[in-house]
Amino acid sequence: MRHTGAATIFAIATFGASFLAPRALALDDEHYARARGMIQKSVTWLRAQQDAKTGGWAVAPEGPQYPAITGLVVNGLIMDRAIDADDPAVKRGVEFILSFKQADGGIYDRVLPSYNTAICLSAISRINRPEAAAAVEPAIAFLRSLQWSEQALEGTEETGRIDKDHPFYGGVGYGRHGRPDNSNLGVYVQAMHDAGLSCDDPAFQRALVFLQRTQMDDRVNQMPYAKGSRQGGFIYATAENKDTIGQGQSMAGTVEESLSDGTRASRLRAYGSMTYNGFKTMIYANLSRDDLRVKAAYDWIRRNYTVAENPGLGTDGMYYYFLTMTRALDAFGTPTITPLGAGDAPAQSRDWENDLVARLAELQNEDGSFKSVDDRWMENNPVLITAYALLALQTIVE
């Protein structure tokens, strides 16, 4: 996040008691100017990709539709200082999103109700128009019903009503109480944050319970798959499916780890995008900087700092990683990162915003779109990855 002035004083959305702190500029003038130019090119390209008939983006001729993609684009557009809710592209995009409002309050077509609703809620929460505002509270209520808890909605796949001891507690899945994971929980928490919910809201506090069970550190996580682990980062889920509850799941496989008792064993591997998702949620939930969960996650981030790839997954989900990284570090409020090298020795401090702008500049095409480097999780879709990149850049220069 860029601010003018040599030592701007600003309120950081951070841990523990809220406080005011000075923050030096990390994004220098050269990278700021480059980022602004990249944003304008991306906006121009995305405008040209809007479906003339429906007003949506990445519209599937045969369906089902994914209004979340339009939600990402609209969110990226509306963050621009020169674009408001009356902009024709934004207005039509919002109309497309709201055309998928359901009687239950969700915003989705036939699939992925939690994912689509959450991302669309983040977008419409920024739109100062009565029709958008009217859809916010129903969407919040719908999302609440999908979080695994004592008060969850009875689902069609299996009941979502469980107590706090269940490994699914606090999580959110793709369907109506399908197996929860940190990716869906990440967009859920982002939506609740963007909609203005308090950090004390049960949505955040329940999310912390699920997160703790996916953090690979036995000082905070008592699940058997974390025994002896001191990675500090996050995995994907507490189960691969309903038949493996409590066994954990990582999209990054396993890693040989020196355990806390001095032995070595194979453990589920923490990786970049899920660690930044978890870290961001802890920030939004206002955990203290001294909380062991926060310190362990940030140490993982320092040991694995990179803008070359999604650490642990290579190029899989790389643009999604860039966005989660940007949002998490922006919320954390630090302009630099001091990576930890071998033996946890500090390395040279990095201006992460400059690093990420430079990396995205390498990946942007002349027409303003971004190069696909992988096809996993739909990252061969140029609209999707350009929206991810635009949101990251907008967050940096905001």
Report the location of each language-model feature:
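Positively charged n-region of N-terminal signal peptides that target proteins for export
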Residues: 1-4
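Sec/Tat signal peptide C-region and signal peptidase I cleavage site
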Residues: 20-26
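An alpha-helical repeat/solenoid feature that recognizes helix-turn-helix modules
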Residues: 26-41, 52, 56-89, 103-141, ...
